[in-house]
Amino acid sequence: WVAEKLIMEAKKRGLNACIVRPGYIVGDSKTGVTNTDDFIWRLIKGCIQLHLIPTIYNTLNMCPVDYVAHCITVISLSSVASDRGVFHITHPKNPSFRFIDLFNSLILYGYNVTKAEYVIWRNELMEFTLQQEDNALYPLLHFVLDDLPTTTKAPELDYKNTSDIVGQECMVIDEKLMGIYLGYLVKVGFLDKPEPHDKGKVGGLEGKILDLPDIAALEGVEILKRSGRN
């Protein structure tokens, strides 16, 4: 908010400037390289540790970093961007991506997790962290226990300005792309690999379990994070 006020003031004083508002920025869509010290991936890891996923159906506006970088570059070089003012970088609305889709990807790739209502999930998480503090969500406990279905509700954003100038929609976060992200997180040791499974048995996803891709190109890649926390 403060940064946007500064940009608005700069425009008042005659400088060419615009505001770019991306959604949740996640990893590269081709390599899966992503920052692990991040709410989304901590949420995923915490659910795996708890063996539970909450049934939250809010829209999750996730955008791969390579798309966000492309948008920022094109907008920055546009001669009309300053006149447009604000640019939202969003996941496509059709099909949209929801928190439940994020969590379902864990089932799809063979993780031992079960769906539960948010209140049940929250109570189990509270009990888990009372016994031990090594859950990935422990640093964010105050947030995830504070009515996550309400606090994660997001408004619909108008991306017409971005669409007009960039001319390219964000790639859809689908099961293949989620596999790339999970594959990277396993590769760098942030997530454990799913246990061996019977491909004929999986709950709620029409009986199909996929294998995580082998991110061979990432040999020797260091884990990316903002801090020393695991």
Locate the predicted segments by residue.
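Active-site Tyr-X1-5-Lys
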Residues: W1-R21
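Short glycine/proline-rich turn/loop motifs
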Residues: I48-I56, F143-D146, S163-I165
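Alpha-helical substrate-binding/gating segment
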Residues: E9, W41-P54, L60-F97, F103-Y111
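Flexible glycine/proline-rich, aromatic-decorated loop/lid segments
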Residues: I19-P22, T34-Q49
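Amphipathic terminal alpha-helices
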Residues: E156-N230
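Terminal hydrophobic/aromatic helix or amphipathic segment near a protein terminus
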Residues: F99-K153, V172-E175, G189-V202, R229
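Beta-sheet entry/capping signal
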Residues: G14-I19, G23-I25, R84-H88, C170
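Conserved sequence/active-site signature of Rossmann-fold short-chain dehydrogenase/reductase
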Residues: I25-G27, N94
